[in-house]
Amino acid sequence: MKNKINLRSLAAQAIEQVIEQGQSLSNVLPPLQQKVSDKDKALLQELCFGVLRTLSQLEWLINKLMARPMTGKQRTVHFLIMVGLYQLLYTRIPPHAALAETVEGAVAIKRPQLKGLINGVLRQFQRQQEALLVEFAEHENRYLHPKWLLKRLQQAWPQQWQEIVDANNQRPPMWLRVNRNHHSRDEWLALLKEAGLEGFTHPDYPDAVRLATPAPVHALPGFAEGWVTVQDASAQGCMRYLLPENGERILDLCAAPGGKTTHILEVAPQAQVMAVDIDEQRLSRVYDNLKRLGMKAEVKQGDGRFPEQWCGNEQFDRILLDAPCSATGVIRRHPDIKWLRRDRDIAELAQLQAEILNSTWEHLKPGGTLVYATCSILPEENSQQISAFLARTPDAELHATGTPASPGQQNLPGPEEGDGFFYAKLIKRRN
């Protein structure tokens, strides 16, 4: 049965759920991938990610090629045409195959009467492709970002915004974290080479390896045994500032899916770690990661604004707060972020971050370390957030990350090869 399923129609349905219903691709895609063969899973992912990466270009092309957009019950056809255009523009799929499979997708979504329309639009694009692309190269949509986000990036990063946008529009690299309790990084790289894969180290993060070409996890030496974990280099940077030690009581707040929880335990296997997240469903990923790596932590569901509900009056030696954020630093990994976020979200997120910071600080021991981290590149959530916190918190001191005038360490996507990420290390003064 699996080989009869039309991939293009599944991709169109997934994109419709993201754009029309505001669902996250990471929630929508896995159930659809279960319907197809292993070799087709990667193509389905490529079609979904690719269309969302280039959505504003595909939208512009459809407006040029069609007299009026498809609406209502025909809306899925609109996204099916996008899938067709994406294949013609960005994949090595032979045009005749891309056309035939996309047109056939109309049958799968129960719109067989529109096969001729889909075929006509895609063939018209083939005829006019060169002229259309020349015109699009001058259009404001060419940056493939919504206007509100482009404006914020230009304001925040007047010198670098074009590099950031370009990085956001690329396929992401695949970074791994070698479990130092099993192998040194060099030892594991030798195993990787034996497996026929090539990897590169990171100059700043001692456990990080970037694959020359992304590979499925089952191809990685010892993945199932916990020798290695998929985690972006920038996320690994948290340990440079947290510096966990054996015997300490450590809180990992907003911990799902558990990448940083397990990194803490790799660096300090005898630490007593509590991992907390508000999302019960995502906590299952924390359990999965702990199990694969053979580790133990206290895992709790809880709201970061109300720590007393899940830890009483307890205080911690170190706290890692990976705060909820706009995720504007990981757009290349999650291109749906561009279309799911709204401008108004940024102020709401900044308010939530401030509330969590305030309440969490009360549970840090005097002399203790709190690392505030986000995968955002917007100052409202990062340097401005920390400036405001330092101004209202007399016993907080910035350490090893920036200056009081410009607090925190900001990684941008691209130049550092990792994702966009922000860290601020705060020490609680002793009385």
UniProtKB/Swiss-Prot annotation:
Protein's GO biological process? regulation of DNA-templated transcription; rRNA base methylation
- The gene that this protein is the product of is rsmB
Q: Which family does it belong to?
A: Belongs to the class I-like SAM-binding methyltransferase superfamily. RsmB/NOP family.
Superkingdom assignment? Bacteria
Alphabetical list of PROSITE patterns matching this protein = NOL1_NOP2_SUN, SAM_MT_RSMB_NOP
Where is the chain membrane-spanning?
Answer: none
General function of this protein: Specifically methylates the cytosine at position 967 (m5C967) of 16S rRNA.
Q: Which reaction does it catalyse?
A: cytidine(967) in 16S rRNA + S-adenosyl-L-methionine = 5-methylcytidine(967) in 16S rRNA + S-adenosyl-L-homocysteine + H(+)
One Pfam family name from the record? RsmF-B_ferredox
What broad class describes the main subcellular location of this protein? cytoplasm
Q: Where does S-adenosyl-L-methionine bind?
A: C254, A255, A256, P257, G258, G259, K260, D277, D303, D322
Cross-referenced InterPro entries, in alphabetical order? MeTrfase_RsmB-F_NOP2_cat, MeTrfase_RsmB-F_NOP2_dom, NusB-like_sf, NusB_RsmB_TIM44, RCMT, rRNA_ssu_MeTfrase_B, rRNA_ssu_MeTfrase_B_ent, RsmB-like_ferredoxin
This protein is called: Ribosomal RNA small subunit methyltransferase B
Q: Which residues form a coiled coil?
A: none
Q: What is its EC number?
A: 2.1.1.176
Residue ranges for the region (Disordered) are 398-417
- PANTHER family associated with the record: NOL1_NOP2_SUN FAMILY PROTEIN _ ANTITERMINATION NUSB DOMAIN-CONTAINING PROTEIN, NOP2 YEAST -RELATED NOL1/NOP2/FMU SUN DOMAIN-CONTAINING
Q: Which UniProt keywords apply?
A: Cytoplasm, Methyltransferase, RNA-binding, rRNA processing, S-adenosyl-L-methionine, Transferase
Q: Where in the cell is it found?
A: Cytoplasm
Q: Which organism is it from?
A: Klebsiella pneumoniae (strain 342)
